[in-house]
Every structure is written in structure tokens, then in C-alpha cells.
Amino acid sequence: MDHKTYQPKMPDIMEAIFDAIYLLFDLVAGIVFFAMAQGRPLFVLYGILTLTLCGGDAFHLVPRIFRAFRGSTPKIKHLMGTGLQISSITMTAFYVILLFIWKLTFPGFAAPAAVEVMIWASAIIRIAVCLLPQNNWCTDEGNLKLSILRNGVFAVTGIGVMILYAISGNAGGYHMTKMVAAILIFSIMSGLYFVRSIVVPLG
């Protein structure tokens, strides 16, 4: 596609602006967490959590922003595909970090061994599946079967984390029961997004 003749479309521009604001917000939030940490492990973990999400998403959102203004090219298409792979892995790490945040927030609770195994096993399996070349991340075809498998395992990881926050409930006055709904919504939206990324061509 000739960049000189490409005319950006308004929906693409609006999406690009939203993506840029989202990444900037995450970046600032992560920096604030680290600045306020003062050696407190919980704040450090929240900073790592935020920057993990921001950093992973940046790998596929930045190419999308470029595509919105310059059109699609083989290089941008490849970067978007690779970015989706990276963000799939970092989103899995996001849930594992939430496990450690739960442990620090509620030291009086012990994670059931079965739930912890469930979280770790599903996270490792998902990352392993994400690394398979058969995913065809950088092609329009993708791999619907592996996409379903990835997101199915991802749902298991999310359910494991939700169980932990349901167990702790409102202990300590943190009102962490709301985390259950937040994680559920995040899991559903993430799953829908990545299924869409397989169904809708990258270019």
C-alpha cells in the first residue's frame, strides 16, 4: 500500500487515539505505583502488574496505531501478529502476578494447593501453546483450534484467580470481592478480542 495515497479512516483514527490513551494511562499508573512503593513489596507488584499489561499490549497496539495512519504493510502486519503473541503471554503473566498480589494482600489466608496448581499449570500450558508456530500469528489464516485452546486454558487461569479473591472476600476491608467481577469481565473481553484477532485479518 502506498503511504502517500492512503487516507486514514475516522473509526481507525478513533481506535488509535483510544489505544494511545490506554497505553499512556497504564504507563503513568505503573510509574506512580513504583514511585509510591518506598520499598513496599505490594506496591512494587502493582507496578510490575501494570507495566506488564502495558508493555505486552504495546507490542500489538503500537503497530495498530501506525496502521491506522499509514495503512497496512507486510512489516506492520508481521509486527501486529508478533505483538499478539507477546501480549497473549504477558496477559498470562498478569494473572500469575495477581496470585502473588493476593498472597501479599491477605497473608492470613493460604491458597488451596489445588487452586495454586490450577493457576500455575494452566498458565504454563497457555504460554507453551502461544509459542507454537502453528498459531500462525502473522498470517490472516491464524489457527482457530489453537485460539480456542489458548483462550480455554486462559479461562481456567482466570477462574483460579477468581476463586482466591472469592475466598478472601472483604477481609481487611479491601472489598476485593469486586475483583471477581473485574477478572471475569477482563477474561471475557480478552478472549473475545483474541478470537476476533483470528477471525478478522491482520491487514
Where are the predicted features?
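Membrane-interfacial loop-to-transmembrane alpha-helix junctions, especially the N-terminal start
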Residues: 39-51, 76-79, 110-118, 175-182, ...
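Hydrophobic transmembrane alpha-helical segments in integral membrane proteins
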Residues: 2-26
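Juxtamembrane "helix-exit" motif on the non-cytosolic side of transmembrane helices
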Residues: 33-38, 66-69, 101-106, 129-140, ...
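Alpha-helical membrane segments in multi-pass integral membrane proteins
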Residues: 118-124, 143-199
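Amphipathic alpha-helical packing elements
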Residues: 43-69, 197-203
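Membrane-interface interhelical loops and short amphipathic "cap" helices
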Residues: 2-11, 42-43, 66-79, 136-144
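Alpha-helical transmembrane segments of polytopic membrane proteins
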Residues: 15-23, 53, 80-92, 146-158, ...
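Internal transmembrane alpha-helix with an interfacial aromatic "cap," most often the third helix
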Residues: 30, 55-117, 124-138
